[in-house]
UniProtKB/Swiss-Prot annotation:
This is L-cystine uptake protein TcyP. The lineage of its organism: Bacteria, Bacillati, Bacillota, Bacilli, Bacillales. It is a multi-pass membrane protein. Belongs to the dicarboxylate/amino acid:cation symporter (DAACS) (TC 2.A.23) family. InterPro entries: Na-dicarboxylate_symporter, Na:dicarbo_symporter_sf. Pfam families: SDF. Gene3D superfamilies: Sodium:dicarboxylate symporter. It comes from the Bacteria. The chain crosses the membrane at residues 3-23, 34-54, 73-93, 107-127, 184-204, 225-245, 263-283, 347-367, 371-391, 395-415.
Length: 464
């Protein structure tokens, strides 16, 4: 019986995929197809929730099949991330886009990411205080106990890693290993390796222009092929969003969400407020924030449904270059750094809120100005340190809580709502990296404002 029900669910999913394909054949805009996929995925997931239990075998097996589309799409994006970063950054050097301002570009992007993370921490603190979020009364079940054990094991290894060791982890001792994404710091390591190749190219160009020109032509050919691969994968975005959204909603435990409803609500209020701050920063830079919102919507939608900042990188880079008019070098640096450094959602809002929740349990008044200022500073600085250990929100929270001498057990107690909150956090992370790239490009005078201000026509190219 279960097999029949699973078959029906999969058949419905395939029909919905067929509808999206029909929309593509009718040349419905890319944005509309992504938005349709998001809405239909939510509705389909809710229907499955209503018919079955989230933990039922039917839902579990159906989600496994849905994963062929959703997780398959994410894996394709992850496949292209490293080649895209490597080729794009080297290409930026060969096109003389990163010859003079390399240090200024890197410093400005990282500075904006860390600054906005500090602001995000303040927003998280305000949301926690406003909604009176507290760890008191949270119960530890079997799932939470298992998660706590894993958290404590991981924390032990993080605690032993010194700051110099974290910084050394960023260097690519084996670039071919990092191209496989084997280490938490692989993304930044590939950026550094690509920058070294680019700098070497500039030196070779001065002494041996013929060899440099040959390398440039070869790289241009590889770049064209990689970008064609990116375009082919991006066309699958609506199908990936549909499957990921249906899978997430169908498998969510509504009862657990309701128990931690106050925390979930406070988290999303903080995420929305921080996103509005991104728009305000863009407006203060002399750019139209509505134009930004319209052009990055598909990227944020995918980040929301996939919960993968790294998986969203190809869309992130494509949107920055082709839609926002950001120069190639800045777009690649902003997207790459944003995966590991200064994540507004995972390393900003989330750790700050957990610290505010757990502080009263050890006799600390979380509303004391000294505690708040210290927490904001620790969150901002730690958001850079996370780059050396990886692990996203969980380990960002571990670093902050341990630095503040607070219990780390709270990280395990919110496991039941982790997927739901992580969706919003990831979207904010990606928005933060694009905001950093946009503002940096504007301040350095490298923004193509004609591209930024024109109507979005690039989505049509992806669709064709």
């Amino acid at each position: 019986m279960n097999t029949l029900l699973v078959g029906i669910n999969v058949a419905v999913m395939l029909i919905l995929v067929g509808v999206l394909y029909y929309m593509q054949r009718k040349h419905v805009s890319f944005n509309k197809r992504v938005f349709t996929a998001l809405g239909v995925g939510i509705i389909f997931g809710l229907i499955l929730q209503f018919i079955y239990e989230p933990t039922s075998k039917v839902i579990i097996e159906s989600n496994t099949w849905f994963g062929l589309i959703g997780s398959g799409y994410v894996k394709l994006l992850q496949m292209i991330v490293m080649p895209l970063i490597l080729v794009s950054i080297i290409s930026a050097f060969t096109k003389l886009q990163l010859t003079k301002n390399l240090g200024k570009i890197s410093g400005l992007i990282i500075g904006i990411l860390i600054l906005t993370t500090g602001i995000a921490a303040a927003v998280g603190i305000a949301a926690s205080a406003g909604f009176d979020v507290s760890a008191t009364g949270l119960q530890q079940g079997d799932a939470e106990s298992a998660r706590l054990k894993l958290v404590e094991e991981r924390f032990t290894s993080i605690e032993k890693t010194t700051i110099p060791d974290k910084l050394l982890e960023l260097l690519p001792t084996n670039p071919f290993l990092d191209l496989t994404g084997a280490r938490p710091t692989s993304t930044i390591s590939v950026v550094i390796f690509a920058a070294f190749i680019g700098i070497a190219f500039i030196g070779v160009k001065r002494k041996y222009p013929e060899q440099a020109e040959l390398f440039k032509k070869m790289l241009d050919a590889v770049y064209a092929i990689v970008m064609r691969m990116v375009t082919l994968i991006l066309r699958l975005t609506p199908y990936g969003v549909l499957a990921l959204m249906a899978k997430t909603v169908a498998g969510s435990d509504i009862n657990a969400i309701l128990k931690l409803g106050n925390f979930v609500l406070a988290s999303y209020v903080a995420l929305i407020v921080m996103f509005v701050i991104h728009l305000l920063l863009i407006a203060l830079s002399g750019l139209n924030p509505i134009q930004y919102l319209k052009k990055v919507f598909p990227v944020l939608t995918f980040a929301f449904t996939s919960r993968s900042s790294a998986g969203a990188m190809p869309l992130n880079i494509e949107a920055q270059k082709e839609k926002l008019g950001i120069s190639e070098g800045i777009a690649n640096f902003a997207a790459s750094f944003g995966v590991s450094i200064g994540q507004n959602g995972c390393a900003g809002i989330y750790p700050a809120m957990l610290a505010m929740m757990v502080a009263p349990t050890v006799g600390i008044d979380p509303l004391q100005p000294q505690f708040i200022l210290t927490l904001i500073a620790v969150v901002a600085i730690s958001s850079f340190g996370v780059a050396g250990v990886g692990g996203g929100a969980t380990f960002a929270a571990l670093i902050v809580l341990s630095t503040m001498n607070l219990p780390i057990g709270i990280v395990a107690l919110v496991i039941s709502v982790e997927p739901l909150i992580d969706m919003g956090r990831t979207a904010l992370n990606v928005s933060g990296s694009m905001t950093a790239g946009l503002i940096s490009s504007k301040w350095l005078g490298e923004l193509d404002q004609d591209t930024y201000n024109q109507d979005d026509t690039k989505t049509g190219e992806i669709a064709s």
